[in-house]
Amino acid sequence: MAYTRGTLSFSTEDGNNYSYSKSEPYTSRYLIWSGNYYFILPKSFRLSIAPGINYGHTNYSYIYQTSLQDASGILNSSREDVLQLRGSATLFKKITDRQNAFFRAWYGSTSNDVSYSGTSPYDNDFSDTYAGASLGYNFSDKMWNVSADVALQWEKNKINDLSVEEFYPLINLSAGFSPSKKHSFRTYFHFGANYPGASEKTPNVLQQNELMYYTGNPNLGLSRQVTFNLSYNWMPVNAFSASAFVQYFGEFNLYVPVFNPYNDGKALLRTFETDCDYNRTQIGMSFNYKLLNGNLQLAASPSVSLYRVSGLFDIKRSPFYCNASATYYLGNFYFQASYQTRSLTVQGNRGVIYKDRNFYQMLAGWSRSGWNIRVSAMNLFRKDWLCSTNILSTPLYSETQYVNGNNFHQRLNISVTYTLGYGKKVKRGNEVGEQYGAASAIMK
């Protein structure tokens, strides 16, 4: 359940201040099944089949009340049923000891049935259907590891009686080169596309408060994505290693929120338009150094990110980020001190600048024979509850949102786990996994 309180002060005829409260209670239930079937075939062929089904039901309410005596408030209730079917089949072929190839085909369909009642009643039927096929190749030897796959995907989005469909290519290229044990290079390139979610394409109008209404844009199309990574690793001795990297991510024709006058200029209507090019470049390094026969380990990872957003939002930011840690091992015991600076990111499809807090931690633990006992002291001198700040600025509407929580508040954690040494291999610190259902189409 999400709950928000706020106070808005402005000049009114009677001179009284204004306050509001907002709550968003919801419940979601999911049934999830997924399978993975593996077959060994003649002539060095292998076949992998992965089907899956998700069903979900969500009840969501938006309740808004004000201090005005004559105001009736806002109540929007929604019920959603979502069904997701998906499946893929991959045929692998071993050509030689150094070469492999594969052919993959996939299909998926998600349908969302959403019914709104209350202040803004409406019914919506969404469906997203996609299918595609790809060819891939891999070559590896003592120095090289090269992979490439090319795919063609068809996707169709339908909202009530309006549909949009498109064919688009997907490309993945990667290469690794290790001339010696001390040096290695790796690069990766991806070209793809992304469709907006169903909630961003909702055609109905929902009232949020006296001055704000929300709607989607059924005509939103896909955006193009480009990813490029290049890294270098250097390990002159076992006790020391360093790496340098550059990463680029670009998304073009990206949808962003747009605010327009509504209700004869007495309110604003938030919708979405394709009016953004998003570019993020990150340059960084990392270092690891072992002392005292490996019992003391020092690590640091500084980086700088270059954000450039053009279109409706003209945003330029170049934040610096670094995390560092020192870990000491004494028999079955271990101790760690770590610190990370505040991070800043620019969220392209929201036009929001996100800032969190710096974080520091002292940790002590004991591990033996599957047991892991750990005590962590975090942010011991910070008593406030502020987690992050979200800043949105447009010509007609600006918003600064302060998010509270315990992520950066002073706290003490005690963890005791025991891991059985058979069956599925799990990652320490994440012994219990979590399953997720299909994406919701409810507009919020």
Where are these regions (language model features)?
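Primarily recognizes Gram-negative and organellar outer-membrane beta-barrels
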Residues: M1-P236, F240-G365, R374-K444
